[in-house]
């Protein structure tokens, strides 16, 4: 057995969140006020740029004067994402953050979640007892939960094993004028995003298939999901030969995690499937070091499934939903699966292996067949599947591919509502021949360099039977190299919000 390399990461970020009917300056701590560009030209008589503080009327006269002076100083514009912090000299409210909201017709759920996260991150350099958001009517009521979700997600980063953490979690955050329901929903969404990010950001020595399954079991126990874990013996009994082939070179054997949320009575379930390659060396088709350094993130699809299922359970969504995570570590040993191997999958279809670094689709072949066995209304899978999708769409956009346009439209609409950019790629039948094999039913890579994201989806289409299905390639947006004001580098938790919205709206 390998040595136990598990360490204790920083605790999962938890803080007290409250809904307040009115501003109490005696316990406000750091006060966050929303500002927008002035309704006129945005310039004062002396040519300085001006802004308008939306909730200034709720402040006592002396503090209101301080805020108005700042807004007319020329340093505050109210542009979206702009944060201006200053000491007030006021004993009750010693520190204020003016948060730019932008023009009212440009404010979205995306800007709301980024606002909440950016504010908290800007204050995270030292411990804070209390942060109070008093944004007035600067954020639409239907987006209040997004501000809260952002504030929560802003407390999580990739600094899990720093001896001196770069993010200090505030003890409490209050939201003035937000309903208790909005605060509760936002907290649950933010925590679910953070669970996804935590899973991806953990080192691969810890978040291997066994470690991932244990994390999922803990989540299920905490939020009331049913959890079933298939170990290697169960995988053998279920004829999951594709998952076993990918993972057999690793000392950490494969797993399949099934999470079940029963909220919809007798209706057929929706199934969300995630690729969970907890580390991808490329196998015998070995990646170079530069291509391997971030490959702990190759299980972001499965991590997203866990985040989505946690949110559904916490929000008590009235739907039946099953989350499936196919977990394997793609390593190198004398027992590695090889180029030229033919694998009989759980469905009975055979795969010719021409590249062991196209392993995610092989893992998904069996996992999707398990999904089909659940007799679902629809299947959505997520995977960091292809670099080709990043070449096609860039690193910020997820690719959608489908066998059912109505389902794809519903998923795309949900993503657009949550401001998570997606784009549909074609699934023309002319691509079918690209994955046909001369020695097996199909092969695990297409012909040549072209259309790689689509040929990967065409491979997966072989394993969904006639079930309505959408494949989401999140290779670009799931993991990023550089931080932004609203999030750390590393895992992003992309598509958790979008899939929760899709499931809530599913008819």
Swiss-Prot record:
Gene Ontology cellular-component annotations: cytoplasm
Cofactor(s) required, per the database record: Mn(2+)
Single GO MF descriptor: manganese ion binding
Subcellular location: Cytoplasm
InterPro entries: Leucine_aapep/pepB (IPR011356), Macro_dom-like (IPR043472), Peptidase_M17_C (IPR000819), Peptidase_M17_leu_NH2_pept (IPR023042), Peptidase_M17_N (IPR008283)
Annotated PANTHER family: CYTOSOL AMINOPEPTIDASE, LEUCINE AMINOPEPTIDASE-RELATED
Protein name: Probable cytosol aminopeptidase
């Amino acid at each position: 057995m390998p040595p136990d390399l598990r360490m204790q990461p920083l605790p999962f970020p938890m803080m007290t969140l409250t809904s307040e009917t009115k501003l109490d300056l005696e316990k406000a701590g750091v006060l966050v006020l929303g500002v927008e560009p002035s309704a006129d030209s945005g310039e004062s008589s002396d040519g300085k740029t001006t802004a308008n503080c939306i909730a200034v009327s709720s402040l006592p006269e002396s503090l209101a004067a301080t805020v108005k002076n700042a807004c007319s100083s020329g340093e505050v514009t109210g542009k979206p994402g702009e944060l201006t912090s200053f000491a007030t000299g006021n004993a009750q409210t010693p520190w204020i953050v003016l948060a730019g909201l932008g023009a009212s017709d440009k404010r979205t759920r995306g800007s709301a979640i980024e606002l909440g996260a950016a504010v908290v991150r800007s204050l995270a350099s030292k411990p804070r007892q209390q942060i109070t958001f008093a944004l007035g009517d600067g954020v639409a009521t239907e987006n209040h939960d997004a501000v809260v979700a952002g504030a929560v997600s802003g407390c999580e980063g990739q600094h899990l094993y720093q001896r001196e953490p770069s993010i200090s979690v505030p003890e409490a955050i209050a939201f003035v004028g937000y309903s208790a329901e909005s605060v509760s929903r936002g907290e649950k969404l933010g925590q679910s995003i953070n669970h996804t990010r935590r899973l991806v950001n953990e080192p691969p020595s810890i978040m291997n298939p066994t470690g991932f399954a244990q994390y999922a079991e803990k989540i299920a126990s905490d939020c009331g999901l049913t959890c079933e874990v298939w170990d290697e013996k169960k995988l053998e009994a279920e004829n999951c030969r594709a998952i076993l082939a990918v993972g057999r070179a690793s000392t950490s054997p494969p797993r399949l995690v099934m999470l079940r949320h029963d909220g919809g009575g007798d209706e057929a379930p929706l199934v969300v499937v995630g690729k969970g390659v907890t580390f991808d060396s490329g196998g015998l088709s070995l990646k170079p070091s530069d291509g391997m350094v971030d490959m702990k993130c190759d299980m972001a699809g499965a991590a997203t499934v866990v985040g989505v299922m946690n949110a559904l359970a916490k929000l008590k969504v009235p739907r039946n939903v099953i989350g499936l995570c196919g977990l394997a570590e793609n390593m190198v040993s004398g027992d590695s699966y090889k180029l030229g191997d033919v694998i009989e999958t759980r469905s009975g279809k055979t795969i010719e292996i021409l590249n062991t670094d196209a392993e995610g689709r092989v893992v998904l072949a069996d996992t999707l067949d398990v999904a089909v066995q659940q007799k679902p209304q629809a299947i959505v899978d997520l995977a960091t599947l292809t670099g080709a999708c990043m070449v096609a769409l860039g690193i910020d956009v997820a690719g959608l591919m489908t066998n059912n346009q109505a389902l794809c439209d519903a998923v795309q609409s949900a993503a657009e509502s949550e401001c998570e950019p997606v784009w549909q790629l074609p699934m023309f039948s002319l691509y079918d021949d690209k994955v046909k094999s001369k020695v097996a039913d199909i092969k695990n890579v297409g012909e040549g360099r072209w259309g790689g994201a689509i040929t990967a989806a065409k491979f997966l289409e072989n394993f969904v039977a006639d079930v309505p299905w959408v494949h989401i390639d999140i290779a670009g947006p799931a993991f990023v190299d550089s931080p932004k004001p609203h999030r750390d580098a590393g895992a992003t938790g992309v598509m958790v919000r979008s899939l929760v919205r899709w499931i809530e709206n599913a008819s």
